[in-house]
């Protein structure tokens, strides 16, 4: 199993912890709430033979810093994801987001579509987007 490269990427007043391993197109894995980069460790090890797999601790979570006194927005977190894509790769990525991470992936696709080659959204809490039943 490949040993991940661990680093912190500075973005807008935060130090975002990320780890990446493997070679190939960038595959950014965005975790949900109450998780961190470690959530994807097993999957990252398996996928690293085909991709450069990147996972990270979202702003103000686990090993990442940030100003907890300021409201965090999905837009801010999408900019954090974009900064990681730019720092580790060539400005484009396949993105997989789970739960709250899926919302970040959707925001990234809506506001910076040029950064996304493909987006997989898993368990996105988007109930407000559904029609009234």
List the model feature ranges, each with a label.
Residues 65-77, 129-130:
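Catalytic nucleophile-loop/oxyanion-hole region of alpha/beta-hydrolase
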């Amino acid at each position: 199993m490949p040993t991940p490269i661990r680093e912190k990427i500075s973005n807008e007043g935060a130090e975002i912890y990320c780890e990446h391993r493997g070679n190939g197109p960038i595959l950014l894995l965005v975790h949900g709430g109450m998780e961190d980069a470690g959530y994807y460790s097993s999957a990252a090890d398996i996928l690293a033979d085909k991709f450069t797999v990147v996972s990270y601790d979202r702003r103000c979570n686990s090993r990442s810093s940030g100003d907890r006194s300021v409201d965090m927005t999905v837009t801010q977190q999408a900019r954090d994801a974009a900064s990681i894509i730019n720092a580790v790769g060539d400005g484009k990525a396949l993105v997989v987001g789970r739960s709250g991470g899926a919302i970040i992936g959707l925001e990234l696709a809506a506001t910076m579509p040029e950064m996304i080659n493909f987006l997989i959204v898993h368990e996105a809490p988007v109930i407000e987007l559904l029609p009234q039943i």
